[in-house]
């Protein structure tokens, strides 16, 4: 009855108005699982390949009809007849069918869409929510959100070099309380920016994108908004950054064009250390470029004892890249993006490897999202303890927060909010 009888993909639009892949998997008893694939703007060089058509006459070359055809053709032919509960075997079959190291033939967007839709169908077939089906009875930890309230870098049309300025409500009693705290700070920040004559337009991930160039000015606005909302920075709510440093790493230097600075690797470490000394920052993502291993080691040696140093472009949710980072002593946390590696099985393998090495995990969205809230379930399933899914605006972001609220309600008394347990040092 849990046999796959049909797999169908279609081209839909993501939150940036770009095409992406959506997949339906239908089982013999009529159960159907559906998944939509996200897409990133600042992408790591080592990510699995997202297949785009390149036909400039459609969607400026960003169409995904070839990936859709791969699902409806080769992949469907391979997987129809499989038992949907055999996730590992199904993912392995698709990886073998693709035959490349980076899923470049069929496309990671094709493979991932099927992988997640299969998991959803199997969860429904077994009458379990997705977080329980994937995570088992131990899945009960609700993650602390990293709420991106000021956008810069590749996510906004402004001169801010650092890509994301985030708040983390560690003092919340539960996820519902955390969302409320974040929303209150978000709305307070809007008033502060407006009062300063700055734009309150939002970026790709729902955060504000004001026309300011200084990292410290952005941080000051966030601190002031936390305080005016009635909370204490560094006690109730902490700060987190996503530098996306690979985006401004040019010819061996870190070029902060918004601030008019060009820094060596060591100087960039000093720059970040000074921010940590002056602000209640507990997490920095991609503080160094993806190939600057020496810089990552220096940053980890300098700040790793007290700050979570998250590898996104560095690790790309890839067990091989993560293993190298662990061996080199670089970073102490991994950002988890299912589309970077391209299958649920490989994602879970990377998460487990990070856990075993005492690295933390942060479940993450992409800047190009849909209403699909799968990552909320996966955050709980893997007991990540942290989730990064944008600001308190745009329904593509709020879909994940709302799903976490539902999951917490369903878990009842066994639900645990990670809260202060994520703090280091």
From Swiss-Prot:
E.C. number(s) listed in UniProt: 4.2.1.11
GO biological process: glycolytic process
Major enzyme class: lyase
Positions of disulphide bridges: none
Listed pathway(s): Carbohydrate degradation; glycolysis; pyruvate from D-glyceraldehyde 3-phosphate: step 4/5
MF annotations from Gene Ontology: magnesium ion binding; phosphopyruvate hydratase activity
Amino acids binding Mg(2+): 242, 285, 312
Residues holding (2R)-2-phosphoglycerate: 163, 337, 366-367, 388
Entry cofactors: Mg(2+)
UniProt keyword annotations, A-Z: Cytoplasm, Glycolysis, Lyase, Magnesium, Metal-binding, Secreted
Reactions mediated catalytically: (2R)-2-phosphoglycerate = phosphoenolpyruvate + H2O
InterPro entries registered for this protein in UniProt: Enolase (IPR000941), Enolase-like_C_sf (IPR036849), Enolase-like_N (IPR029017), Enolase_C (IPR020810), Enolase_CS (IPR020809), Enolase_N (IPR020811)
The keyword Plastid is annotated on this UniProt entry: no
One Gene Ontology cellular component annotation held by this UniProt entry: cell surface
Free-text cofactor note: Binds a second Mg(2+) ion via substrate during catalysis.
Subcellular location: Cytoplasm; Secreted; Cell surface
Similarity field: Belongs to the enolase family.
Protein name (database record): Enolase
Annotated source species: Ruegeria pomeroyi (strain ATCC 700808 / DSM 15171 / DSS-3)
């Amino acid at each position: 009855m849990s046999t796959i009888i049909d797999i169908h993909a279609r081209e839909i639009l993501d939150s940036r108005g770009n095409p992406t892949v959506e997949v339906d998997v239908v089982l013999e008893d009529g159960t159907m699982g559906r998944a939509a694939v996200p897409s990133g703007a600042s992408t790591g060089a080592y990510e699995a390949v997202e297949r785009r058509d390149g036909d400039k006459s459609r969607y400026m070359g960003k169409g995904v009809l070839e990936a859709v055809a791969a699902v409806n053709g080769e992949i469907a032919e391979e997987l129809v007849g499989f038992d949907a509960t055999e996730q590992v075997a199904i993912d392995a079959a698709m990886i073998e069918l693709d035959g490349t190291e980076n899923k470049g033939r069929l496309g990671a967007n094709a493979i991932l869409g099927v992988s997640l839709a299969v998991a959803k169908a199997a969860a429904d077939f077994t009458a379990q929510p997705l977080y329980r089906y994937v995570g088992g009875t131990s899945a009960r930890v609700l993650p602390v959100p990293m709420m991106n309230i000021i956008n810069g870098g590749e996510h906004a049309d402004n001169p801010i070099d650092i890509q994301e300025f985030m708040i983390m409500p560690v003092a919340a009693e539960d996820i519902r309380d955390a969302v409320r705290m974040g929303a209150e700070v978000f709305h307070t920040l809007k008033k502060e920016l407006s009062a300063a004559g700055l734009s309150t337009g939002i970026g790709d991930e729902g955060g504000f994108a004001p026309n300011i160039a200084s990292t410290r000015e952005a941080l000051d606005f966030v601190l002031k908004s936390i305080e005016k909302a009635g909370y204490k920075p560094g006690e109730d709510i902490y700060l987190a950054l996503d530098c996306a440093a690979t985006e401004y790493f040019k010819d061996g230097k870190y070029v902060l064009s918004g601030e008019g600075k060009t820094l060596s690797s060591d100087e960039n470490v000093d720059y970040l250390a000074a921010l940590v000394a002056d602000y209640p920052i507990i997490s920095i993502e991609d503080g160094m470029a993806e190939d600057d291993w020496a810089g990552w080691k220096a940053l980890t040696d300098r700040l790793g004892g007290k700050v979570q140093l998250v590898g996104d472009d560095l690790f790309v949710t890839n067990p091989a890249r993560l293993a190298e980072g662990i061996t080199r002593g670089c970073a102490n946390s991994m950002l988890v993006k299912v589309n970077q590696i391209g299958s649920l099985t490989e994602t879970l393998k990377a998460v487990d490897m990070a856990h075993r090495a005492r690295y933390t995990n942060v479940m993450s969205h992409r800047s190009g999202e849909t209403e699909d809230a799968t990552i909320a379930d996966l955050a709980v399933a893997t007991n990540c303890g942290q989730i990064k899914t944008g600001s308190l605006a745009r329904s593509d972001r709020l879909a994940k927060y709302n799903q976490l609220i539902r999951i917490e309600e369903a878990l009842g008394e066994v639900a645990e909010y990670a809260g202060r347990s994520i703090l280091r040092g």
